[in-house]
Amino acid sequence: MLQFILRRLGLVIPTFIGITLLTFAFVHMIPGDPVMIMAGERGISPERHAQLLAELGLDKPMWQQYLHYIWGVMHGDLGISMKSRIPVWEEFVPRFQATLELGVCAMIFATAVGIPVGVLAAVKRGSIFDHTAVGLALTGYSMPIFWWGMMLIMLVSVHWNLTPVSGRVSDMVFLDDSNPLTGFMLIDTAIWGEDGNFIDAVAHMILPAIVLGTIPLAVIVRMTRSSMLEVLGEDYIRTARAKGLTRMRVIIVHALRNAMLPVVTVIGLQVGTLLAGAILTETIFSWPGLGRWLIDALQRRDYPVVQGGVLLVATMIILVNLLVDLLYGVVNPRIRHKK
């Protein structure tokens, strides 16, 4: 087991270095002068322009800027935002909490709906329900997030007036932003908020969670169905049926438990999909998370924010994938003993 862990950790280091290099190169390839963007319509004198370039370290050769960036990362310094002059880490934390809360709710929705639908589709293979589930899963997987979000807003929020259009809570909800309990709005409003605040936070969460969870839901349905069909054809399932076990016991205890191994892996790998989808979802619903933060930073060429934000997001994806690999090695010894 130790060798398995060391092999996985050995892959993390070069991946991390590659991410820093690609992120740095990508950010500096974006056209536009960050100093001129900061100045806006006011303009700036050549002397002041050169002074700001020197203060931001942008007057140095690329390799020196990269080494300075790596040195800061190794010491936990991701830089300071060019716009707000606030350390990137301090800007990252509250936005990460907002995105994490949205991502967890989206994954709960996708898992709670996807696994039962996938199991039922496999059990009723060839039925109308099976064909409908597969068709909807394919549609959900290929559906543009932006279009799907706008359609739900028009139908549910505007036409039916059932949920709010944007934000995490309504303007009338008061919470002490300077001293949040957890940073997660659902928890804070449940513990600290006044009557109705929690319901308001839940109402704001519904549509973004559905939109963000649609693609993972489609993937989970397809993987659960495929894995269940494979397991239901195994000899030990036929043996369990021959022993007179009830159909429900065979499906839940014997089939589903073994079919969940690839499903768990897929769920873990959906973290990247959630973070990518969060960029569009947060833009549509004005959700103050990582997606909107990075998009705003890209538009104003805020190099430290983009580099630090992408690096932190990539690190989270790497750690989650590493955790999934380790858990899969625990539940499936053949994987960890494989050379």
UniProtKB/Swiss-Prot annotation:
**Keywords annotated in UniProt:** Cell inner membrane, Cell membrane, Membrane, Peptide transport, Protein transport, Transmembrane, Transmembrane helix, Transport
Chief location bin? membrane
List the NCBIfam families hit by this protein, alphabetically.
PRK10914.1 (NF008161)
A Pfam family (short name) is BPD_transp_1_N
Positions in the Periplasmic compartment: 1-9, 124-135, 193-200, 281-309
Enumerate the SUPFAM superfamilies for this protein: MetI-like (SSF161098)
| A GO cellular component entry from the record | ATP-binding cassette (ABC) transporter complex, substrate-binding subunit-containing
Originating species = Escherichia coli (strain K12)
Entries under PROSITE patterns matching the protein? ABC_TM1 (PS50928)
Q: What is the lineage of its organism?
A: Bacteria, Pseudomonadati, Pseudomonadota, Gammaproteobacteria, Enterobacterales
Give me the segments passing through the membrane.
Answer: 10-30, 103-123, 136-156, 172-192, 201-221, 260-280, 310-330
Would the keyword Transmembrane helix be found if you checked this record's keyword annotation?
yes
**PANTHER family, per this entry?**
DIPEPTIDE TRANSPORT SYSTEM PERMEASE PROTEIN DPPB-RELATED
On subunit structure and binding partners, the annotation says: The complex is composed of two ATP-binding proteins (DppD and DppF), two transmembrane proteins (DppB and DppC) and a solute-binding protein (DppA). MppA can replace DppA as binding protein for heme and ALA transport.
The record's GO molecular-function terms, alphabetically, read: dipeptide transmembrane transporter activity
The record's InterPro entries line, in alphabetical order, gives: BPD_transp_1_N, MetI-like, MetI-like_sf
As for what it does, the entry says: Part of the ABC transporter DppABCDF involved in dipeptide transport. Responsible for the translocation of the substrate across the membrane.
Q: Where in the cell is it found?
A: Cell inner membrane
Cytoplasmic topology ranges: 31-102, 157-171, 222-259, 331-339
Name the source's superkingdom: Bacteria
Name-wise, this protein is Dipeptide transport system permease protein DppB
UniProt record similarity statement: Belongs to the binding-protein-dependent transport system permease family. OppBC subfamily.
